[in-house]
Every structure is written in C-alpha cells, then in structure tokens.
Amino acid sequence: MKKVLLLLFIIPFAQFQSQWIEKAPENPEEFVNPLIGTLSKPSLSNGNTYPAVSVPHGMNLWTPQTGKNGNGWQYTYDADKIRGIKQTHQPSPWMNDYGMFSIMPITGKMRFNEDERASWFSHKSEVSKPYYYSVYLADHNVTAELTPTERAAQMRLTYPDSEDSWFVIDAFDKGSSIKIIPSENKIVGYSTRYSRGKLTNFKNYFVIYTDKPFTKYSTWKDKDFVKDALEITGDHCGAVVGFATKKGEKVNLRIASSFISLEQAELNLQRELGKDSFDQTLNKAKLAWNDKLKRVEVAGGTIDQMRTFYSSLYRMLCFPHKMYEIDQNGKIVHYSPYSGKTEAGYRFAGTGFWDTFRALYPFLNLVYPSINVEMQKGLINDYKEGGWLPEWSSPSYSDIMIGNNSASVVADAYVKGLRGYDIETLYEALLHGANNEGPQATGRLGIEYYKKLGYVPYDVKINENAARTLEYAYDDFAIAQLGKALGKPESEWGEYYKRSQNFQKMIDPETKLARGRNHDGNFQTPFNPFKWGDAFTEGNSWHYTWSVFQDIEGLAKLMGGRKEFSKNLDKIFELPPIYDDSYYGSTIHEIQEMVNANMGQYAHGNQPAQHIIYLYNYSGEPWKTQYWVRETMNLLYQPTPDGYCGDEDNGQTSAWYIFSALGFYSVTPATDQYVLGAPLFKNAKIHLENGKTIEIKADNNSNENRYVNSLKFNGKKYSKNWLSHSELMKGATLKFDMTSQPNKERGTDEKDFPYSYSTDKK
C-alpha cells in the first residue's frame, strides 16, 4: 500500500513539472525562484548567486546571511543557520561586498556574536520572492519578513511570548558606527567596509525605526558590550535593542540607507516608505517586478522552462544597481568614489563588462533602453570624476579581468539607437581608454606593444596576452563603429577598423587556433590548446579562438575556409573534456564546470564560449546552432538551487538563456544584427518601450521539433540567419515552422550569413 501511495504521489508531481503553460502568465514574478544558483561554493559554481530581494536595479539588495561576516558566499543553499538579514551590494562572491549591515531578531539572553545569534532554519519554512523574503528562525521562534524599495525596506518580525525579545544590528568590521536613540525608537549608523578598488570618504549610512518602544538596549564594539554608551565608533560596532512581546506580536522596522549622509537616508525613507504599511510596500515591489517582467511574455512551454525564463530575466534586472539618490531639491545626485564628494547626476555599479557586454547590455538596448540611457549618463560621470571608464565597477574601479569592453557597452547603445546623453564625451573616453594604460584594470594593459606590434606579446610578463589582444581588436571595432555612426572623419575611425584585424596575428597557421606570440614574432612554444590560463583568461585556446566577434568570416579564412571552420566547431563538442591546469596549480572551478557539463570542450559556464554555438550560422550549417542551443538550454539550465552551470555573473549567463529562448542572440554587439537560433516557446511577445511589439510564433515547437524548417518575417519568407535590430524596433512578427529533422537547405547561401567585417559591403 505504501508503494502505491508513493507512486500516486510521484506521478502527479512529475506531470506537474512537465506541465505545459499555454498562456502567458499575468504574474510572471511568481515564476521567479531567487534560490536558483545558490547551491554553490568556491570549488564549484552552480551560479554563485544569492536570493536577492530588491526592486529592479534598486540601490540596495537584501539577502538572508548564512555565511560568516566577510564571506563572499553570503548565502548558500546547503547551510543550516542564518546569521542575519543583510543589506548587500555584492555583485559576485569573487568581488565580495561593500557598505553592508545586517539585522537579526533573537530571543532569550542578550547577545550579538554572529555564531551565538545564528539560528537553524529550514527551506520548508522559507519563502523567497524577488519582492519578499520570509523565514522561520527556529532557535528564536521568530518569523522574519522583508520587502524592499530602491533605497529602503520594511521588516516585520513576529515574536513569541517572551520577556526577552531583541534584534541585533551588525554594522560589520573595518570601520563602523552606531547610535541608539530610545526617545525616537531609532537606531542610526554607518558602515565603511569595502572589498575592491580605492574608495574615498566611503560610508553607507543607515537609519532604522521601530513601531515598538525598546525598553532595553546596548551598543557593542568588537567582542564586548559597551556599558552606558548609546553611541560608539570603532572597527566593528553594533547594537542590540529589546522589549517584551506577546505570542504572535509583530514588530515592524522601517529601514533606509544612503551613500551620502544620514539626512539623505532619512529623506530616502520618507520618500520611499512614507506612511505605507508593510503590505503596501510589498505590493509596490511586486508591481515593480510585474511591470518589468511582463515586457517579455512567453507561453507554450513547460512550467520549469517558464520558471527558468523568468528567473533568468529577474537576474538580468538586479545589476548594475543604482548608486544615485534624489536630494531634498529633487535633483539626482550620487556619492563619487573618486572624489569622495556628492556629485550631480546618475551613477551605477555592480557589473563587469568582460561578462555583460556580450548579451546583457544588448538586451537592455532592445527591451529596456531607458534604463541604459541612465547607465550611459552614469558612465559619463565615471569618466569625468575618475578619468577612466570602468571595466569592473564595484563600486569603483576594480583590478580584475581583462579587456576594454566599455567600448562595446557604449558603442552598442548608440548604434542601437539610444540617445539623450553626451555621446561625444563617451567617445572621447573610449579613445582615451583605447590608447593608454589605466589604473585597476582600466584602459589597456600592454597598449604600447599592441600599437607597435599589433598584439600583446607572450614573453613580456603580461599575463593573458592572447586573450587581451583578441578583446582589444574587437573593442577597436566597436570604437570604429561608433566613430562612423557619429560622422567622425574616416581618418579617425578607419584606424580602429585596421586595428580590429589584429586578431589575425594570434591565429597560428599550423594549428589554426589562437596562440600566444612572442615579441620576436614566433608563436609560444610549447603549445597545448587544452592549457587553461597562461595566454588566455579562465579558458584555453579552444574557447578563445572564436573571440573574433567582428569578423567570423575572416577567422574562417584563416582556418582554411568555412568547411574547416565548421569542422573545428564540431571538434569543440567531439573532443573529450580534458584540460591542463598547470598554470593555476590546481583545478579552478571553471574547469570543473566544463568537465561536469559533459559537452566536450564547450565551457558554457564561463562567458568567452557562450557565443560559439551561434557561429555555425556563418558557415552555412545553422541547424547545428539550433541543435546545440536547445541542448544547452535543456542540460545546463534548471529552476533549482544548482540550476546554472557556472557563475551567473550579474545577468550575462541569464541573458544568454533569455535571448536563446526567444530565438536569437547578440554575437556582435555594436552592429545592427542578432544571429538566429531557434525559439524555445511556442509563443513570445516582446513589448518595446516605443509601443511596438515583436511577436515570435512557433506553433509546432517541441523538444523534438527543435530545427527551423522555415521562417516568415512579417508574413514574407525569410532565409537569412540574422535579424536586424532596426527592423525589429518597428514591430515585427516572426513565424517559425519547426521540425524534428534539420533543413539543410535553409540559411546556407552566403547572402544569408550574418555580418562579418571581411564581407561588409558598406
């Protein structure tokens, strides 16, 4: 009988997981699972995410904290205890956090140590939404809830019957301050902690109000309570406030913060919370997500596909986060990490362009251009105040990763039609960054070699040299595209088109692969195409050879033509997932993720490889793109805590899924084109900000019918392997006829291939 009951339970559950959703949801925010990717650790990333509670691009995010203070893995799904509910600005565990503080309700003995206050919890009593978080803290018999605004939040703490109910405020170490004001039921303070870059006069000020007077309280510093001191400043400060509560009594906290001042934090609180109840704030946050997520409607897929889709779209809208605030005069202002002062205008932080130039920013330009206009204005302020465009902003320049990919982010926005900001200053900033070495991964390391030789040599003690050269060449292409679009003299932008061909100097004619090259012109010897790092960045030659976004046709010629090009693409999936990790001295997590994926040398868990699948469109075999796109979505994305196949990286890995599920991808930002794949859903609608709609239909789509038999664009037969951004922006209907067998006639003519600089007729 027990076996029968078990089967009865399993079968409906399995049916539910594969249930088809035929209608686009009215509440897509309810399909979001913020816990996707949280089952991660330094040695293996399944996303390296945390369950961010925020509004789209909010200045602050919130998360339950399971990791110790200072641990970049601030929430992991396999943890047993929660140490606090934390305000965070952390874009990645590898970047760590800045300006954080936490709040933790407790009962019983007055205490503050993070280990002593921690409580067991269960995922069965945890609710995680983009706009709301709730958890039952078993050791304290307290339920903690939180809902956010852009710069504020409300917490609702439900206590048991206790004479000793408390909450702990932890302002973290490396410089903090706290002040208890009992007469106003108020605690204020600041945190100065940060992890990356150089920050001037940095503080995150916070203010907390309770609706219940606290009758007992104490500040604390480092490891001890501080008697008779309502205000304390030091390395690691905090407070504990308490009161008696009845069973089920709810204590409400109203919280806000500012990077500018306590007065601005108070203003943020009054402006964003006003007199709203917890539930009113929750409903506003829910509506904010609903508005953004419903810009893209999908239907005709399984419930798991819907969950993965909207969870990915949510991740794309968390970062970069706003660093600007609105002052008492209604003016937009921001704390500048460069001057340490309050400056006018927009500013954003929490993104690395090495990751996000590929798909995240192109998707913003298509669906959410107005927020990217603000971001472009923010980049202008970065340049004016700091002297450089950031490549990794957290919240200032961060000395990590390679490339000069701000060029792509700026150029793609303008080429895709974004206007209303000072593009001339941004163009000036790109030229400056393209020709100079800057601090903390800005500008171009090795630029003098690059300008003289056309590449960064392998033997001049500049690491990741081949990868740098390939990325600089693409970035030069982006600058040329922008200069041309701005009507600059050809003598100016023409030079950058020439530099964009420097990729040719990195392709070894013997192996047909990218390879480090010495100062004297000889290629690196010995050479192992499976060796990670060294001449490349978090990858090997099989991954980086294809980073010629601007001229895939030119790359194919160097490989001996399109047939050889396709054969080399095939090898990526046919070769075993072998590797040489000697450069690192151990197996870094990106290597392990490639091995675990079991797709040969294809390393989707890291960004340099994510466009590779789409390159079959350039060699007349688009059906292989269609096959591998669906395989990747099926195998490497799930709506579960281990749902990603590597670092999610601030929306980029999610953006690949969103684009691919819609049927196209941005292989070459800074052009007008997207490269075709095949849609995942039977129906999709993209509601553009200009009021137009892109409708994507694939009535006979299924897991078996993953190949494109034919395509109609606005009712007319369409054979090209690419779509025009400018045409899509007019509104469009794409009708795919899907089949279980590849159509090896469609998209095979050279005239149907996507853009390559070598074949550009303009």
What does each of the following model-derived ranges do?
Residues A698:
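Conserved catalytic core of nucleotide polymerization and phosphodiester-bond processing enzymes
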Residues D475:
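ATP-dependent phospho-/nucleotidyl transfer catalytic cores
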Residues M1-E22:
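Bacterial Sec-dependent N-terminal signal peptides
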